[in-house]
Design a protein with these regions (language model features):
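Class I S-adenosyl-L-methionine
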Residues: 1-71, 77-95, 113-118, 131, ...
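Signature of N6-adenine DNA methyltransferases within the class I
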Residues: 5-6, 10-19, 40-48, 55, ...
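Conserved acidic residues
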Residues: 34, 74, 125, 205, ...
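Short, solvent-exposed loop/turn segments at the edges of secondary structure
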Residues: 71, 218-222, 411-413
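Conserved beta-strand segments of alpha/beta enzyme cores
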Residues: 75, 106-108, 203-206
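A short alpha->loop->secondary-structure connector
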Residues: 96-103, 197, 201
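Conserved SAM-binding strand-loop segment of SAM-dependent methyltransferases
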Residues: 103-114
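Polybasic, glycine- and aromatic-enriched phosphate-binding surface used to engage nucleic acids
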Residues: 277-481
């Protein structure tokens, strides 16, 4: 069996299977003689519940078991690449139908690669499932097969995006697709073509954001999405999910034009969406700049409170923790690299760097990496000579914000820093507020433990918007409950 990273197999708990089938409308007598497929069926978590529901509804209307067997063979379909999971699936389906005294069903479940199957196209009334999550760098031999799909052309793509394209292709007119996948498609570069497709087709019916709740072992934040082919939907319903109680909560009925802001899909109430549109699309004065801190790519070498020398050493703040340390800074105060001769003329520094040389080269030759003794990237070097403010990027509430002044001559790493002439108290009033936390939550960049993160650009846009409108300080952007 392929590794999980290569196969993307993440098996779905039964309660979520039921939720997804309910969202898709696969219940009641309307499911009879309707085609349904799970095109990445694994051991049959969805197909087992589908068979159970079909048998239950059929037997309410007829006791003709021969016809029921024929229906199960005709209307229920599956695809699974892994032969072990495929055999488990067939066994599990046979176990289900044995309860109804059915035997030797000719299951239309195929042990093959869904990427190459086309004969289900335009035939399915329902496409459901939990498609595999595999990042592009883990696709191994499947890379070329995945990259020829339209939805996988941008960014660090993922296999589940190809399955969206496959699923849409399988639907008949009026057919419904309901997947649970990573929620990253709403805001990632990789998901941009899918978002454009949704804007054109207006086929989105429901979005259910599981937010911080993670039903799978895999480190992914997920979302249930329902689409309908051939029927234009002017709006869709956005829901959230109470994970520990398995309850779907309705939040807002929204238009796709409202939630698409700069080719990113945001999920929020209408007032928040309006505020986000003002922040991201309006032009504001450049009052602050927000940048990423040092990226030495070898913090364990360059940063330590106990460096065995004092030359070319500066104070450095770890923005993520608010703790100060010391950094070997082989640059001028303006961030220009010192020459090899200058750096290695100090015996203690020379011995220290030579001792860590193999680690800094990271398997490369000195010829290929002649400046191995410098930081891995140049970001933040030229701002050491400036006053600035450091801030962490992973927060859960205002108390978790770490904001500190960093004077000229000191550096910042593991977080962001702000360049501005605005006074510290004003910045604190903007950042240490529930309004700012509401903004961060609305970005939906989830981190484990209920935390959120944000980018340098998102922080810069927010602060500039607030400062540009500071004279109207009585107006709050985000509603605070």
């Amino acid at each position: 069996m392929a590794t999980r990273k290569q196969s993307g197999q993440v098996f779905t708990p039964h309660y979520l299977v039921c939720d997804i089938l309910d969202v898709a409308g696969y219940y009641g007598d309307i499911i009879l003689q309707k085609h349904i497929i799970d095109n990445s069926c694994g051991d049959g978590a969805f197909l087992q519940e589908i068979v159970q529901r079909y048998c239950t509804e059929y037997l309410k209307q007829s006791n003709n078991l021969q016809q029921l067997s024929q229906d199960l063979s005709t209307y229920i379909h599956g695809i699974e690449l892994d032969p072990i999971a495929y055999n488990e699936c067939i066994h599990n389906l046979n176990t289900i139908v044995a309860q109804y005294h059915l035997q030797q069903i000719e299951w239309d479940v195929r042990n093959t690669d869904a990427l190459s199957v086309t004969d289900f196209d335009n035939r399915m009334d329902y496409v459901v499932g939990n498609p595999p999550y595999v990042r592009v760098h883990n696709l191994a031999d499947n890379y070329a097969n995945v990259k020829h799909f339209r939805f996988t052309q941008d960014g660090m793509t993922d296999l589940y995006l190809a399955f969206y394209e496959i699923g849409f292709g399988m639907l008949c007119q009026g057919g419904k697709l309901c997947y649970i996948t990573p929620s990253s498609w709403i805001n990632s570069l990789a998901g941009s073509i899918l978002r454009q497709y949704i804007c054109i087709q207006h086929n989105l019916v429901k979005l259910i954001d599981l937010e911080h709740y993670q039903p799978f072992d895999a480190m992914a934040y997920t979302m249930i999405a329902l689409f309908e082919k051939g029927i234009r939907h002017e709006d869709f319903i956005y829901y959230t999910y109470i994970g520990d109680k398995h309850i779907i909560m309705s939040q807002e009925c929204l238009r796709i034009e409202e939630v698409m802001i700069g080719n990113i899909l945001y999920l929020a109430d209408r007032k928040t969406l309006k505020d986000l549109r003002n922040i991201f699309l309006q032009k504001h004065k450049q009052i602050v700049q927000v940048k990423n801190g040092f990226a030495t790519l070898a913090d364990g070498v360059f940063i330590s409170p106990h460096l065995p020398f004092t030359k070319y050493v500066i104070p450095v703040l770890k923005a993520s923790t608010g703790k100060w340390s010391k950094a070997l800074f082989p640059y001028t105060p303006q961030g220009v690299p010192l020459s090899h001769e200058q750096i290695f003329s100090d015996q203690a520094i020379s011995e220290y760097l030579e001792k860590n040389k193999s680690y800094l080269l990271k398997g490369q030759s000195e010829q290929a990496c002649p400046e191995w003794y410098l930081y891995g990237r140049t970001q933040a070097l030229k701002d050491v000579c400036k006053d600035k403010y450091a801030i962490n990027t992973i927060v859960i509430d205002t108390q978790s914000i770490k904001f500190e002044k960093v004077p000229s001559g000191a550096g910042v790493y593991s977080g962001l820093y702000i360049l501005t002439e605005v006074d510290e108290d004003t910045l604190r009033s903007i950042l240490y507020s529930e309004e700012f936390m509401q903004y961060v939550r609305s970005l939906r960049h989830y981190k484990s433990g209920g935390y959120y993160t944000f980018s340098s650009k998102e922080l810069e846009q927010y602060i500039n918007y607030k400062l540009d409108n500071y004279e109207d300080n009585s107006r709050t952007l985000f509603s605070i409950d």
